[in-house]
Design a protein with these regions (language model features):
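N-terminal periplasmic accessory domains that precede
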Residues: 9, 24-30, 45, 50-77
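Short acidic/polar hinge/loop motifs at secondary-structure boundaries
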Residues: 14-42
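Periplasmic-side early beta-strands and strand-to-turn transitions of outer-membrane beta-barrels
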Residues: 68, 94-184, 220, 448
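Conserved C-terminal beta-signal and adjacent last beta-strands/turns
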Residues: 92, 134, 418-420, 494, ...
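Face-selective signature of the C-terminal outer-membrane beta-barrel domain
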Residues: 136-152, 181-355, 438-441, 489
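Membrane-embedded beta-barrel scaffold of Gram-negative outer-membrane proteins
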Residues: 206-210, 411-465, 470, 588
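Structural signature of Gram-negative outer-membrane beta-barrels, strongest in the C-terminal barrel
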Residues: 252-254, 267, 275, 312-444, ...
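Gram-negative outer-membrane beta-barrel transporters
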Residues: 336-337, 442-445, 462-545
Length: 588
């Protein structure tokens, strides 16, 4: 699915991402801090009713709590890291009642951007601070707080670019000289406060309040003068100029309150929740692109002066959203107790005040550990999922006198997806080394789709329900100790996703037909202090079309994606048993 079709949760609270980001160069640090993560749950389909109204996948992150073991009263841990791409610092403190994690991260990818075809002054600076405080005064009460501040700056002053393309017999050269600059800023605040009361050992009630605020601006004025030449003959094929301008400003604020009631019995885990959200988004955007070819502004009709692209948007969204779900996890065995079953079933309901739409989403999944093998797990899931619109999906465009105006379509409906999932999991040993093989096949019937195009990481929607389609595939993964004491894995995926738009079959922008990934770790001979990690990736290219064109022109496909990463680490201190030792004894 697209970026907006995947839900991300941190400690039961949904996380949002910036709305104006258009390129990977502008993207900063992930909202998920890897130093603070305890558990990760991910599902590509057939997920439970407690996960929100997204129709592709759900990522559930739980931050860790530090607690001393045994007779210790406190425990601390920390990390310092530095590289050509930035620096990180993390510190955690834990007592019997309190756990406090703090992390600050800084990233700059100017070193990598300097290797691209476009020679420029890249000054991206991304700063992120996160804190997680958990306090348990007694066994009945728990208070959690998560705070996050993210300040991302992207400054770009291009100089020139030269690209060659064509065949061996017909090589062409494209040169551009630039004037101007780009200045962007994405400032985000996120916070959540949760209070949990354990009514009994089997029943708990939680209240969570969260706030998300984002202030974004994207400003650029860049002129490019280009030459297109035939390389072999040095013949000039064309000259021209283009000018790109943007003044985009956006402010987003989402406040939410959530109540969760959980109750456990011998065979059932029942969970019910209600969420109320208040959303406010304001946008003021102006973009245009002028192209001059041989002294004529394109497009040229001999009468009026038009831009190749011009867009204006001044929109405000004020809406309330209500969500509720009820789910139960029922565990039982067959007669004789040889086969074990886990049945999760539930229903999710949501209502949005903007389009007056009420959605019901039933979901069910069944996990089976068959009698013939306790190392085998079978999983089947099905459900009806909706992609509740947020902001970008609402933006509908109309063109008047060569100018495109973006307005909000308040009558839009939620796209839907019907999931059918079948999975297989088998754990085994070879030479007393652990291995795990998983396979999953899925089919998703898509309806009421809002078509969208992707340019880099910017997603632009049509603003109307105009298509239907499907997504299908199979994922295979082998995980295990290829080398004793290390973890490695190999994955292989086959995928296909298409939609029917205006009577024509069109691949969705996410139609990546295959992918192969390998992660391998090994020790250096004679020592376990030195460790090497190797990661290889090969994936099919994604479909694309020329800018500002209809999706029906998605006739191009990018080359296959290839990547190799290698890393090495050396363990200075070996204190895995937790005993106090001299630092020098550990090193030498």
């Amino acid at each position: 699915g697209a970026f907006d079709e995947n839900s991300v949760y941190i400690n039961n609270v949904e996380v949002y991402r910036p709305l104006l980001v258009r390129s990977g160069q502008q993207e900063g640090l992930s909202a998920i801090n890897p130093y603070m993560v305890d558990k990760i749950g991910f599902s590509t389909g057939g997920y439970a009713a407690k996960y929100g109204d997204k129709m592709s996948s759900a990522l559930d992150i739980t931050y860790k709590k530090l607690q001393p073991k045994g007779s210790k009263k406190t425990v601390t841990e920390g990390t310092l890291a530095a590289s050509l791409l930035g620096a990180d610092a993390y510190f955690g403190l834990g007592t019997k009642k309190l756990s406090w994690l703090n992390s600050i991260r800084y990233k700059t990818n100017s070193y990598l951007l300097g290797t691209t075809d476009t020679k420029a002054e890249y000054k991206p600076n991304f700063l992120d601070y996160q804190t997680y405080l958990s306090y348990c005064p007694n066994k009945r009460w728990k208070i959690d707080f998560i705070g996050n501040i993210s300040d991302n700056h992207y400054n770009f002053v291009p100089h020139d670019r030269e690209t060659t393309f064509g065949t061996q017999q017909d090589v062409k050269s494209f040169r551009v000289y630039f004037d101007g600059q780009e200045k962007d800023r994405f400032l985000t605040y996120f916070g959540t406060l949760g209070i949990t009361r354990n009514i009994t050992d089997k029943t708990s009630f939680s209240i969570l309040g969260s706030a998300f605020y984002s202030k974004e601006q994207e400003k650029y004025d860049i002129q490019g003068q280009y030459w297109l030449d035939q390389t072999e003959t040095s013949e000039n094929l064309g000259v021209g100029t283009y000018f790109e301008h943007a003044r985009n400003y956006l402010t987003a604020r989402v406040l939410s309150a959530k109540a969760i009631l959980k109750h456990k019995t011998k065979k059932h885990d029942i969970e019910v929740a209600y969420t109320y959200k208040k959303e406010h988004i304001s946008e003021n955007s102006v973009e245009y692109e002028m192209r001059d070819s041989a002294g004529y502004s394109v497009p040229h009709n001999g009468k009026d002066l038009y831009m190749i692209y011009s867009m204006k948007a001044r929109n405000t969204l004020d809406a309330n959203r209500m969500e509720a779900y009820l789910q139960d996890t029922y565990r039982f065995t067959s007669q004789g107790g040889h086969s074990h079953f886990t049945l999760n079933y539930g229903v999710r309901m949501s209502h949005w005040s903007l389009n007056k739409e009420t959605l019901f989403s039933p979901r069910i999944s069944l996990g089976i550990i068959p009698a013939y093998s306790e190392n085998t797990t079978l999983r089947f899931a099905a459900g009806l999922y909706y992609q509740a619109p947020f902001f970008k999906e609402l933006r509908d465009t109309s063109t008047v006198n060569g100018i495109t105006y973006a307005t909000l379509n308040e009558k839009i409906k939620s796209p839907r997806s019907i999931h059918f999932i079948a999975g297989y999991d088998y754990r085994f040993r070879i030479n007393n080394q652990r291995y795990r093989f998983t396979a999953e096949a899925y089919y998703k019937a898509l309806g009421n789709l809002i078509p969208y195009s992707v340019n880099n990481v910017k997603v632009v929607y049509y603003g109307e329900n105009r298509a239907s389609g499907h997504a299908a595939g199979i994922d295979l993964k082998l995980y295990g100790e290829f080398v004793p004491g290390t973890d490695s894995w190999l994955t292989f995926s086959l995928m296909n996703t298409q939609m029917k738009l205006n009577g024509k079959g069109v691949p969705l922008p996410t139609d990546q037909r295959f992918a192969v990934n390998l992660f391998f770790t090994d020790y250096f001979p004679g020592t376990e202090r030195w460790r090497m990690s190797l990661k290889l990736a090969l994936a099919d290219g994604l479909p694309f079309s020329t800018p500002h064109r209809e999706l029906e022109t998605n006739t191009f496909r990018a080359p296959a994606y290839k990547r190799a990463d290698i890393g090495m680490s050396y363990r200075l201190l070996d204190n895995s048993k937790g005993t106090k030792k001299s630092i020098f004894k550990n090193i030498w």
